[in-house]
Amino acid sequence: MKLLGWMHRKLRQNSNDVFKEFNNAAGGTCNCITGLAASDPATFLATANEYFTADNDFTNNHPSSPAADLFTFGGSGLLTIGTLGIAAVAVSADADEVDYDVDADADSDFDDNDDTAGDDEDQVDSAVTPTFTYAAPPPIEDATVVEKAAVAVVEAIAEKDDDTTTEDDLMVVSAELEKVLGGRNSGTAGDLVASARVSFAMGVDCPLQGFLFGSPVSDAESRLEQPRDSNGGRRTSLGELFMRTRFAEEKVALVAVEEGEDGGDIGAGGERDDRKAGKGGGGHKTTKKRSAKDEKVPRGDGAQASATVTKSKFHKILQIFHRKVYPESAALARNLTKKSRKRGSGAYHKPEPAASKLRCLKEQRAPGFGCCASRASFGGAASPIDGDDDDELNGSKSGHWIKTDAEYLVLEL
């Protein structure tokens, strides 16, 4: 038995059949997998056929929607999103030889849907994009209509009496004047209507413009619901602040014009008073002349006085508008008025007798610039000024404080 066992092992070691133990029913080292069935091709094909048969049964029980329904609203209509009304084309079997026009097919589909209802099997409904209807915007007013309305408002203001003319009317005319000037400077017709300020003449409701620039002062006071600040008072808008500043500037301009006219009359009256009274008392005579002029107005004829006041008022308004239209000429006239006033004041007030002292100080060499100067800088003992004046200028031997305009002028020179 031992000999047979040894021979059996030798034969198994020298044999090339590696998997012969798999078919050995007696056992061995690979008995764990000997229970598996051999792979039979016929059995495998039968199992696969059963699987695919079950898959076909599932497909028959749950059919998928046709591809045409994806482009219509009858089905899911998923692919109609973003198609913008492009119709789906039913392609026949010989699609390679025939060219289709998408627009023509879409038109034909629309005509068929309007006239007759065709067969659903032959034709595919065209994809229709839903449309939204909006209310028509209000017609935009023509620039000529707006301009005519503005001209009518200005003419109505011009026809008013002088007593009934208010500051709001002046603001309307000023705003229209700024529009015209803005259009003239830009050179475009569209800028004639555009303006950064609130237009008093137009009755157009612009809530955003009213929020940004505020409303007219008269309109703002008449509002029922007004914003309140923390203290309980009405909060002033930015537009009202601009309007108040504008009112203040125009009032200052009117006062300046009145002072200019009074100054001319005062100058003429002062010359007449100087001829009569001589040298002194110029300021006193000027005051008397102004009071006499004020007293003469109510004593004279009422119609003549009112005509004079009317003429002066419109003259002032024209001067304000002229200053806005031609700012360069207004500045030049202002400078000339200042020079004439200086010349007129020079006739009344003679220069002080300290000119000789100033001339002596100019002849000295220029000292150092500062709040004080040394005695040597003013020439010391060689100064042409006497001892008392030198002590007044130089409070101490080290320097002096500048007390008069003449000393400051010497330091500047």
From Swiss-Prot:
Motif Nuclear localization signal 1 per record, residues: 275-298
Ranges where the record places region Disordered: 103-127, 261-308
Topology of the protein relative to the lipid bilayer: Single-pass membrane protein
Biased composition (Acidic residues): 103-124
Induction details: Transiently down-regulated by auxin. Down-regulated by light.
Keywords: Cell membrane, Growth regulation, Membrane, Nucleus, Transmembrane, Transmembrane helix
GO cellular component: nucleus; plasma membrane
Coiled coil: none
GO biological process: gravitropism; regulation of auxin polar transport
Subcellular location: Cell membrane; Nucleus
Motif Nuclear localization signal 2 positions after renumbering to this chain: 338-345
Signal found in the keyword field: no
TM region(s), chain numbering: 71-91
Phenotype when the gene is knocked out: Reduced shoot gravitropism and defective inflorescence development. Reduced shoot gravitropism and increased leaf angle.
Tissue distribution of the protein: Expressed in the node of the stem, initiating leaf founder cells, young leaf primordia, tips of axillary meristems, spikelet pair meristems of developing tassels and ears, male flower primordia, tassels, ears, silks and seeds. Expressed in leaf sheaths, leaf pulvinus and shoot apical meristem (SAM).
Keyword flag Phosphoprotein: no
Organism domain of life: Eukaryota
Protein family per UniProt: Belongs to the LAZY family.
Function: Involved in the regulation of shoot gravitropism, and tassel and ear development through the regulation of polar auxin transport (PAT) and auxin signaling. Acts as a negative regulator of basipetal PAT, but positive regulator of lateral auxin transport. Involved in the regulation of shoot gravitropism and leaf angle through the regulation of cell development.
Record-given protein name: Protein LAZY 1
Record organism: Zea mays
Upper classification of the organism: Eukaryota, Viridiplantae, Streptophyta, Embryophyta, Tracheophyta
